[in-house]
């Protein structure tokens, strides 16, 4: 999954969630931090389509079609990985971090491309786990 607002030097959100779950380290997430996750496949499809279009120029932003907060996203990732009782791994730090919104306006591209932004369910379906996550 690709999330806006993540520092380049950091691992991506789903890798961080999975790594901490494997080591049974509590995962700090913010219920007040909204993001629009997109799959790398969806972004690649958009990039390919943009390279084939001579009529579109400029800087564009792309993200998933729906917003989700970090807590819910971490829960869904752990649930998809086959972790029982995912909530037991999550610690809400919204009181410390406050309200953050990484929402992106997709309107400049949305109606110009054949490729559509994926909703959260479709984005998470592209996040494959070949076998249940092993915990240490």
Walk through the language-model features, giving the residues of each:
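Amphipathic alpha-helical segment in the mid-to-C-terminal domain
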Residues: 40, 70, 116-120
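C-terminal amphipathic/interface module of NAD(P)-dependent oxidoreductases
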Residues: 84, 97-136
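Mid/C-terminal beta-alpha module of Rossmann-like enzyme folds, strongest
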Residues: 46, 53-100, 135-136
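Short, surface-exposed alpha-helical segments at coil->helix boundaries
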Residues: 11-15, 71, 75, 103
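NAD(P)-dependent short-chain dehydrogenase/reductase
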Residues: 1-35, 42
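Amphipathic alpha-helical segments that line or abut small-molecule/effector binding pockets
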Residues: 18, 41-49, 125
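Glycine-rich Rossmann NAD(P)(H)-binding loop
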Residues: 4, 28-34, 60-67, 112
């Amino acid at each position: 999954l690709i999330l806006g607002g993540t520092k380049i030097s950091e691992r991506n959100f789903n890798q961080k969630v999975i790594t901490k779950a494997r080591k049974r380290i509590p995962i700090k997430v913010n219920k007040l931090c909204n993001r629009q996750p997109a799959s790398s496949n969806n972004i690649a499809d958009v990039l390919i389509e943009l390279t084939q279009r001579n009529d579109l120029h400029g800087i564009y932003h792309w993200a998933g079609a729906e917003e989700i907060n970090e807590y819910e996203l971490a829960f869904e990732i752990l649930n998809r990985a086959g972790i029982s009782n995912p909530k037991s791994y999550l610690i809400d730090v919204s009181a410390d971090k406050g309200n953050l919104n990484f929402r992106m306006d997709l309107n400049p591209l949305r109606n110009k491309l054949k490729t559509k932004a994926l909703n959260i369910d479709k984005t998470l379906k592209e996040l494959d786990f070949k076998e249940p996550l092993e915990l240490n």
